[in-house]
Amino acid sequence: MNAPDGLQRCFVLHRRPYSESSLILDVFSEEFGRITLMSKGARSKRSNLKGALQPFTPLLLKWSGKGAMKTLRQAEPISLGLPLTGINLYSALYVNELIGRVLMQEVPMPGLFHDYLFALTELAQADNPEPALRRFELALLAAMGYGVDFLHCAGTGEPIDPQMTYRYREQKGFIASVRRDNLTFLGNELIAISERRFLTKEQLQAAKRFTRIALKPYLGGKPLKSRELFIQMRIPRTRSMEK
């Protein structure tokens, strides 16, 4: 994919040191999707980019190069970084890791970029991050072509009944079921997932179950680092509350 002619709206998903003064950036761009950039000299004392090339800071970036790793040529922060703290910060790190693990390099996804920006904005303001996370996971699955009909029974084609139980079958959809287990959902839960609107705790938990099932093949067996960090954060907090 050719390099852009002008500045592009981007977010840094992850950054790591390279050599004595440079950075390698995993970037999510509006028009080019995920790209890898080298920012030469970004860690030097004289660099004015040192504080700008951070996750959750809206950026305008320009780069050059044709290989897998491009060279950053220009960077301008659009605004200050989004105010993310505590559990909401760990939730945003999870979103970044999810994009980095699931999306292929250099596949344009402008719609998902807007969903990502909306998710970060929600997380910066939310008391409970769970609804924003579920909405983004569902948007990510849709962007990758993971099409699921939440509103019709895959066996009969009839509209989903809010009171009935349905079993999820991968690549088929939801089939009416009389048993309840981890792969079954109430009709009202499926309707809530379709509308991305979660009015009850049960609907939110059902959405989390579904996205875990759907994302598992993309994530493989490797655990998410952000989830491990979140668990480590919760353990000291729980112990202090017990004291």
UniProtKB/Swiss-Prot annotation:
Keyword DNA damage in annotation: yes
Keywords attached to this Swiss-Prot or TrEMBL record, sorted alphabetically, are: DNA damage, DNA recombination, DNA repair
Q: Which cysteines link up through disulfide bonds?
A: none
Q: Do you know which InterPro entries this protein is assigned to?
A: ARFGAP/RecO, DNA_rep/recomb_RecO_N, NA-bd_OB-fold, RecO, RecO_C
Which GO BP terms, alphabetically? DNA recombination; double-strand break repair
Superkingdom of the source species: Bacteria
**GO CC terms, sorted:** bacterial nucleoid
- Function, please? Involved in DNA repair and RecF pathway recombination.
Q: What does the similarity note say?
A: Belongs to the RecO family.
According to UniProt, the name of this protein is DNA repair protein RecO
Gene this chain is encoded by: recO
